[in-house]
Amino acid sequence: PVKWEVASDDRFKTIVATGEATARPELGHSVHVEVTGLQPDRPYWYRFALGSDQSTRGRARTLPLASASPARLKFGVAGCQNYEDGLFTAFRHLANEDDLAFVYHYGDFIYEYKQRGPDYDKDGLPVDQVRHHVGLDCYDLADYRLRYAQYLSDYDLQAARARHSWFPTFDDHEVQNNWVSDNDGRDQSP
């Protein structure tokens, strides 16, 4: 089992919740933990351990009470991040923002297809991608898991995700470009 801890301080001197969860292969060896009893509108720190291996420390901020009326709410916004189009240095800047309540990610966390040729700059000259997707297009669960793992291997993205609570939503590329209902626009559905 994976052990987890939540603390009220970044050095884990005051542990406020602990537990264990099983990382199942059918769920991509991931765990989902719901922690109760936390105070509203404040940061907490968390970490995971499996045997002697320990995760990077993360920070999450709880929401204000539903009845609260905060005088100010500052949050980050991100989306449409194509791994092949550039480095994720903007996420490092987001990670360095200390006073964000959360990050809202409006979708296109991944791009499910591989670029087939060069992009073009403003003068119409070909420009190679900065880095390349592993594999081709995503068609099955294994393809999508590999693509997410590749995106999540970026250190700047890891830093931003460890620093702030995230509220993501989906757009088309999490499924397929321009996907609408039964009209998938490709020969094989994801």
Q: Where does each model-flagged region fall?
A:
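Metal-dependent phosphoester/phosphodiester hydrolase catalytic core
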Residues: 1-190
